[in-house]
């Protein structure tokens, strides 16, 4: 239950910091890395999406590195 709460809180924080949401800027997925080695610029997701998050267990994934660079600065 604590993990669900923390994930929900994380999602709310991330979505509130996204500057512009549009069809190409939407978060593709949030992926949990089993090894906890998620960091900005790593590939994540089913089709090699790009991670945009600080070092940790959860990756916020976008369709392209350019979108990550735009939304994560």
Curated annotation (Swiss-Prot):
**Pfam families the record matches:** Ragweed_pollen
Disulfide bond in keyword set: yes
Signal found in the keyword field = yes
Q: What is this protein called?
A: Pollen allergen Amb t 5
Please give the superkingdom of this protein's source.
Answer: Eukaryota
Instruction: Supply the residue numbers of the propeptide(s) excised during maturation.
Output: 21-33
The subunit field of the Swiss-Prot or TrEMBL record says:
Monomer.
* Keyword terms of this UniProt record: Allergen, Disulfide bond, Signal
Q: Which residues form the signal peptide?
A: 1-20
Disulfide bonding pattern of the chain: 38-68, 44-59, 51-61, 52-72
């Amino acid at each position: 239950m604590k993990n669900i709460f923390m994930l929900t809180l994380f999602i709310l924080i991330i979505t509130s910091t996204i500057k512009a949401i549009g069809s190409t800027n939407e978060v593709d997925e949030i992926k949990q890395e089993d090894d906890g080695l998620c960091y900005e610029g790593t590939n994540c997701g089913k089709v090699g999406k790009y991670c945009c998050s600080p070092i940790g267990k959860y990756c916020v994934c976008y369709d392209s590195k350019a979108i990550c660079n735009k939304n994560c600065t």
